[in-house]
Amino acid sequence: MKKITRIGIGGPVGSGKTAVIETITPRLIERGIKPLIITNDVVTTEDAKQVRRTLNGVLIEEKIVGVETGACPHTAVREDPSMNIAAVEELEDKYPDSDVILIESGGDNLTLTFSPALADFYIYVIDVAAGDKIPRKNGAGVCQSDILVINKRDLAPYVGASLEVMARDSKIMRGKKPFLFTNCKTGEGIDDLLRLILDMALFDVTTNRPLAASA
């Protein structure tokens, strides 16, 4: 069985993790990459239901699974990721020709990271509306993630946040690790995010396959 790349997507509640998945999934499929999706919620599977609605006609709903963790979000993806690993393995067994699994954590604080037993690579999503101080708070998600996404850049003037300050502090906290600003509503920055994912996590996946209407 081929190795299916596992990409974790974490971040605080409301930062736009689900929106990132909903915007990059059609672009992955357009490039011939076959995705699977797992979402985490503490006491519901609401995010999975939303993703199924949004991606209706793009990705069959059986490839989108919700995990009801019943525990702290970071526990389910780091300290004890057994429920997520079981969900991943079940999807991999059902769809062995897939290329990537996107694993969205439940909303959590800035310390969230993914166990290497669960994710090969992880993206951390923050949003401008939380304030321009967030990057310099030294959270593990901000500093250690493979890609930092600063979402909702269009809200900066409404909340008094400085994109320049956020960029400066992200460079200081992350060193050479990449970060970028996005607006999932308009698609701004999403193609740049996709390029980073392809280059850093999916470089060994053939991308010149025929375009598919659904996957």
From Swiss-Prot:
Signal peptide: none annotated. Its main location: cytoplasm. GO terms for cellular component: cytoplasm. The keyword GTP-binding applies. Keywords: Chaperone, Cytoplasm, GTP-binding, Nickel insertion, Nucleotide-binding. The keyword GTP-binding applies. Facilitates the functional incorporation of the urease nickel metallocenter. This process requires GTP hydrolysis, probably effectuated by UreG. Belongs to the SIMIBI class G3E GTPase family. UreG subfamily. This is Urease accessory protein UreG 2.
